[in-house]
Amino acid sequence: MNAYQNKNITIIGLGKTGLSCVDYLLSQQANIRVIDTRKNPTGIDKLPQNIPLHTGSLNQEWLLESDMIVISPGLAVKTPEIQTALKAGVEVIGDIELFCRAATKPIVGITGSNGKSTVTTLVYEMAKAAGVKVGMGGNIGIPALSLLNEDCELYVLELSSFQLETTYSLKAAAVTVLNVTEDHMDRYMDLEDYRQAKLRIHHNAKVGVLNNEDRLTFGENENQAKHTVSFAENSADYWLKTENGKQYLMVKDEVILPCEEATLVGRHNYMNILAATALAQAIGINLDSIRTALRHFKGLDHRFQLVHQANGIRWINDSKATNVGSTVAALAGLYIEGKLHLLLGGDGKGADFSELAELINQPHIICYCFGRDGAQLAKFSSQSYLFETMEQAIEFLRPTLQSGDMVLLSPACASLDQFASFEKRGEEFTHLAQYSV
């Protein structure tokens, strides 16, 4: 008899992740109920009809009748109904905890405020180049539980702070917290509360990859990996060497790759490459396979992506920059011949935008602010314009563009005030950029 057979388990949240929990727990012969606080949740049509479903609110009675609650990462454990269930002795976990209890192959775990998806995909490509049967999922692409159905020798998981809050059994082969900057401040008490959720990834890990430029990423107390390696521009195991005007990605004294041979560009991407290389080497991936992946990896959509170039003007879609730290990373070390036309705005999620002030208050940077928090962002630049929508901003700036200029969508905000997702925002930007011909 398995641990879930005949247990009363309530799954909160449908969508891809919720349905993966349903499929897995059905295979374990559990008695399942599903709750979704939305009236018409996505995935409702894929739920087997014999499974009880409650929508529109949290059903406290169902929660208290449960042996276990599997909570959606989108719902905070601090929610009163969940706290009531916890006080009554009901176990509350997430889908990643279910996965970790079942997985028998090594896991690489990646979290951080920015760069998670790029590093996760890089490690996946490096393992694939080495001939390893590897599955990638979690907060990216496929729900982790769905990977259990695949023939994998290795799992590479992108993990959000929300997922880590309800994960207790992760014993990863290698992990990293890439960086910690303000994000989801509408969910956490403060930056330290958010950071502690991220640091849970280090618990029981064999190797922790540390960002030497960000002490907030270092594990502490029970959340420390057994062994650590570091990455940074200088003074680290994995570092960036500059010699005769050229840059090289290094591990100790060995060249991983000249930066000009990597398909990813920009200092923030070089840090991502170093972190991914450290993780890959920690699980035994050889440098030749790592080099192959780095030469062929094209990057991910909506992440500092060149979507149009004409008449000497570059249009860059960085719609995935949904927080201040991500936009800071995009602007750091950016060299432009002409003007930078920076599109900022959306839902700031309660973040402090002041960190942007010094970076954007430059003679060559003009800010075009839009969306819910556009007015707040516009205050930080002496050269700013305010619009209701991104489209209005682009139509305004278009006639002013000259050769050498860059139009950069790196909004420092979530998109949900005006768009269905950051992808939709990026797609609209791309469409408007390509229309510029």
UniProtKB/Swiss-Prot annotation:
Primary subcellular site in the record, as a coarse category: cytoplasm
GO biological process: cell division; cell wall organization; peptidoglycan biosynthetic process; regulation of cell shape
EC number: 6.3.2.9
Catalytic activity annotation: UDP-N-acetyl-alpha-D-muramoyl-L-alanine + D-glutamate + ATP = UDP-N-acetyl-alpha-D-muramoyl-L-alanyl-D-glutamate + ADP + phosphate + H(+)
Subcellular location: Cytoplasm
InterPro entries cross-referenced by the UniProt entry: Mur-like_cat_sf (IPR036565), Mur_ligase_C (IPR004101), Mur_ligase_C_dom_sf (IPR036615), Mur_ligase_cen (IPR013221), MurD (IPR005762)
Pathway listed: Cell wall biogenesis; peptidoglycan biosynthesis
Cellular component terms per the entry's GO annotation: cytoplasm
Entry GO MF terms: ATP binding; UDP-N-acetylmuramoylalanine-D-glutamate ligase activity
Record keywords: ATP-binding, Cell cycle, Cell division, Cell shape, Cell wall biogenesis/degradation, Cytoplasm, Ligase, Nucleotide-binding, Peptidoglycan synthesis
Chain positions recorded as ATP binding sites: G112, S113, N114, G115, K116, S117, T118
PANTHER family xref list: UDP-N-ACETYLMURAMOYLALANINE--D-GLUTAMATE LIGASE
Entry's family note: Belongs to the MurCDEF family.
HAMAP family with a match to the protein in the record: MurD
NCBIfam families the UniProt entry points to: murD (TIGR01087)
Purpose of the protein: Cell wall formation. Catalyzes the addition of glutamate to the nucleotide precursor UDP-N-acetylmuramoyl-L-alanine (UMA).
Protein known as: UDP-N-acetylmuramoylalanine--D-glutamate ligase
Lineage: Bacteria, Pseudomonadati, Pseudomonadota, Gammaproteobacteria, Pasteurellales
